[in-house]
């Protein structure tokens, strides 16, 4: 039991007055892999990421809670785990550099100013906080080599345990760990951090120079840190029932602060021995009390309530250990917060204590212990406060650090505000393994607005190419305002714009025989013309043979003009078998008939980086064919951009047409059309492009297995208000809870769910109506 008692005590070095600010930082030695030596111990820190706990269903919350209990049970014996939540307010300089658009001196600066005003306004309304979560494990080891071997095993266990909660863990380097301390010690100067271990060693500099504040002074009940003041509190009184939301409620307070939960797991044999001694002690007290009562001839007196309660609690604790897979944990909760002045600090302290009192807990100020308290709360691996509380695993797990996933990518664009945490949602789709995605929602939910907002942000902040297929003539005005070009494809204008459906760029096919993929495209084209179930196997062979015939000369050197649908028609007519004539007859209307818009050589030669293909005038007979031809033309453009090192963003409205037959009935699911789209979907990622499908017909799309696969594998989904059947389909496909899906049930326009990677976050994105951007993007009748 001596070791057990030692773990309850504070870890202090022999006292000495620090001669400099650097000396007040209790780090003895650092190593390249992020291991620190502190007070005779070694420590290492990992960063872990939030999960959707607050918006999960009660059943899912219970599951997450029990998984977190299992994680706590897996923490190593003989070591201290410190879970740290670090809130820092968004640095204005970083904010301006990463989110605000610089002016370019062109006509689009008007829109950039409006965009910047929107983001600044939303940031002012939001918490404007960045929260990071860390776990630091510290242990006494004989050497750094022994410590590294120990931390390697611990890191594997942490990754395994937290991955079961859909959280990820990242081991942080020495630079990351020093940056974390620098950001706390020097708030507002985050961008100034510079450190190179080799240079520091070569120059014999103290590594603490790069993180130390200008000055630090510890007073009776607060400390001064540079131009700021701070105070550290500890959880003194625990409620008999603590809400699992208390920790996140504290961390929602909009100030720079850090909260740490020190957890020391106790070996089972030590815990059982300790509880047995407690039970024996209580029983002895009860026996002595009864003996005194007997001596007074009082044989009917009841055992005092406090003794009975102590016996009951001790036995319950023993039962938890022996029967309910609980472990004994020694826990300590400390919290430090910063303010600009002492008056504000006192107000913040009272507000934080009030949050605790509302949950039946009491946070007290550590008087004359502010230095030890600060070093305890920092993620160093130290515990210098004697205020541990004996808890079971479940009681410790109630101090839940999880709330809601955040989406805040570096170099991203603004998508709205997190409806749970009220922080900005900033996503960079280029960081995803597959940046392709969908925007879905019923009519009037704001899906066109969402797509246009993303298009606008990309057009104003990047030099990427943007290509839009617009079947409903919704994007033209915005594209022209952004300096792009609108190409109207019409079946009724013989002298208008034409796109050759059989264009073929060098490099077409992703390294495969280009003719194979082109043949598949023409199969999908015929599928749209004739119907998914109307093409017989022998007819497919005829089409494939004719495709080879008409491309034979062109593929030798890609010189001259590529063949057209008219050439394909002529080749089919030359053949003697009646099936070839049947196929040619199906093509006649689209080659020599009135709908021959795609049978001419391409007469579009635009260099504009923002293109909108307006295909509204194609009519219902040609719209699905037009979508397919547009996709093939875009595929050629993406290949060309790849060779030139350009990034391309492609938007296809009414994408459900790829999964429904060409007649527009929407009941017969196609094969080649959806497969061609899926191949483009997969290849675009390799070619430096993203493809976004926009639709309100989710259920109709999901009748296709290919569409289901595309939805399930999409790392980006923007879901606005959904119809009931669509909502049910998406919930099953994504494994989303009823609570999450409630955000797309009768949701106002611009509200819904956004899925980025593994994160599914409810969002709100309302644009101010008194802006030119809103006027260009709105499709509401009567809004001009």
Region locations from a protein language model:
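Extended, folded cores of ATP/NTP-driven motor/assembly subunits in large transport
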Residues: 1-402
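Conserved lysine of the Walker
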Residues: 447
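Hydrophobic positions on the alpha1 helix immediately C-terminal to the Walker A/P-loop
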Residues: 450
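Post-Walker A helix-loop "phosphate-sensing" segment adjacent to the P-loop in P-loop NTPases
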Residues: 457-467
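Hydrophobic anchor at the beta1->P-loop junction of P-loop NTPases
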Residues: 439
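Conserved AAA+ ATPase "SRH/arginine-finger" region at the nucleotide-binding site
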Residues: 488-493, 716-725
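The conserved Walker
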Residues: 431, 443
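P-loop NTPase motor domains
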Residues: 51, 58-77, 88, 251, ...
């Amino acid at each position: 039991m001596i070791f057990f008692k030692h773990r309850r005590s504070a870890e202090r070095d022999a006292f000495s007055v620090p001669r400099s600010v650097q000396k007040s930082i209790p780090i003895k030695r650092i190593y390249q892999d992020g291991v620190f030596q502190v007070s005779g111990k070694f420590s290492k820190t990992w960063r872990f990421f939030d999960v959707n706990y607050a918006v999960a269903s009660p059943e899912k919350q219970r599951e997450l809670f029990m998984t977190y209990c299992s994680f706590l049970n897996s923490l190593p014996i003989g070591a201290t785990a410190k879970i740290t939540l670090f809130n820092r307010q968004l640095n204005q300089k970083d904010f301006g550099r990463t989110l605000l658009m610089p002016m370019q001196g062109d006509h689009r600066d008007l829109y950039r100013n409006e965009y910047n005003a929107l983001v600044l306004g939303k940031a002012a309304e939001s918490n404007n906080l960045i929260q990071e979560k860390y776990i630091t494990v510290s242990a006494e080891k004989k050497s750094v080599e022994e410590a590294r071997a120990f931390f390697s095993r611990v890191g594997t266990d942490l990754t395994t345990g937290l991955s079961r909660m859909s959280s990820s863990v990242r081991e942080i380097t020495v630079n990351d760990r020093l940056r974390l301390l620098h950001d706390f010690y020097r708030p507002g100067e985050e961008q100034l951090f510079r450190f190179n271990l080799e240079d520091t060693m070569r120059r014999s500099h103290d590594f603490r120079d790069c993180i130390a504040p200008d000055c630090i002074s510890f007073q009776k009940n607060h400390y001064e840190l540079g131009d700021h003041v701070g105070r550290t509190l500890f959880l003194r009184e625990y409620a008999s029932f603590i809400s699992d939301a208390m920790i996140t409620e504290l961390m929602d307070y909009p100030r720079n602060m850090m909260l740490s939960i020190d957890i020391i797991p106790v070996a089972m044999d030590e815990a059982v021995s300790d509880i047995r001694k407690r039970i024996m002690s209580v029983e002895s007290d009860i026996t002595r009390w009864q003996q005194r009562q007997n001596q007074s001839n009082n044989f009917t007196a009841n055992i005092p309530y406090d003794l009975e309660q102590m016996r009951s609690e001790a036995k319950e604790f023993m039962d938890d250990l022996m029967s309910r897979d609980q472990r004994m944990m020694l826990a300590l909760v400390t919290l430090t917060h910063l303010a600009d002045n002492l008056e504000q600090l006192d107000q913040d302290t009272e507000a934080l204590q009030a949050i605790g009192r509302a949950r039946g807990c009491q946070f007290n100020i550590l008087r004359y212990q502010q230095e030890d308290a600060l070093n305890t709360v920092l993620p160093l691996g130290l515990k210098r406060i004697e205020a541990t509380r004996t808890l079971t695993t479940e009681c410790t797990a109630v101090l839940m650090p999880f709330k809601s996933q955040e989406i805040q990518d570096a170099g991203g664009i603004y998508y709205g505000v997190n409806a749970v945490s009220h922080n900005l949602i900033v996503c960079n789709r280029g960081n995803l393994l597959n940046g392709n995605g969908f925007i879905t929602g019923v009519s009037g939910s704001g899906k066109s607005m969402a797509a246009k907002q993303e298009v606008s942000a990309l057009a104003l902040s990047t030099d990427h190419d943007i290509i839009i297929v617009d079947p409903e003539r919704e994007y033209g005005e915005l594209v022209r305002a952004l300096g792009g070009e609108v190409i109207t494809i019409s079946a009724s204008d013989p002298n208008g714009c034409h796109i050759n459906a059989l264009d073929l760029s060098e490099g077409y096919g992703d390294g495969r025989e280009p003719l194979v993929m082109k043949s598949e495209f023409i199969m999908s084209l015929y599928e749209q013309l004739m119907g998914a179930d109307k093409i017989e196997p022998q007819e497919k062979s005829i089409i494939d043979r004719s495709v080879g015939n008409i491309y034979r000369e062109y593929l030798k050197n890609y010189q001259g003009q590529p063949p057209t649908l008219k050439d394909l028609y002529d080749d089919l007519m030359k053949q003697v078998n009646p099936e070839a004539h049947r196929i040619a007859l199906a093509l006649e209307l689209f080659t020599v008939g009135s709908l021959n818009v795609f049978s001419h050589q391409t007469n579009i030669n635009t260099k504009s980086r923002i293109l909108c293909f307006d295909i509204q005038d194609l009519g219902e007979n040609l719209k699905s064919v037009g979508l397919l031809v547009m996709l093939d033309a875009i595929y050629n453009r993406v290949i060309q951009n790849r060779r030139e090192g350009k990034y391309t963003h492609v938007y296809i409205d009414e994408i459900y047409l790829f999964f429904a037959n060409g007649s527009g009935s929407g009941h017969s699911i196609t094969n080649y059309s959806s497969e061609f789209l899926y191949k483009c979907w997969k290849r675009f990622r390799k070619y430096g492009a993203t493809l976004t499908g926009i639709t309100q017909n989710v259920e109709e799309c999901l009748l296709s297995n290919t569409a289901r696969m595309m939805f399930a594998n999409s790392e980006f989904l923007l879901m606005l208000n959904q119809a009931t059947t669509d909502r049910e389909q998406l919930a099953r496909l994504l494994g989303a809870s009823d609570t999450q899906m409630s955000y797309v049930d009768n949701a106002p326009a611009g509200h819904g769910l956004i899925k980025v990677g593994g994160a599914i976050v409810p969002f709100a994105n309302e644009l101010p109506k008194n802006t030119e951007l809103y006027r260009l993007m709105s499709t509401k009748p009567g809004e001009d």
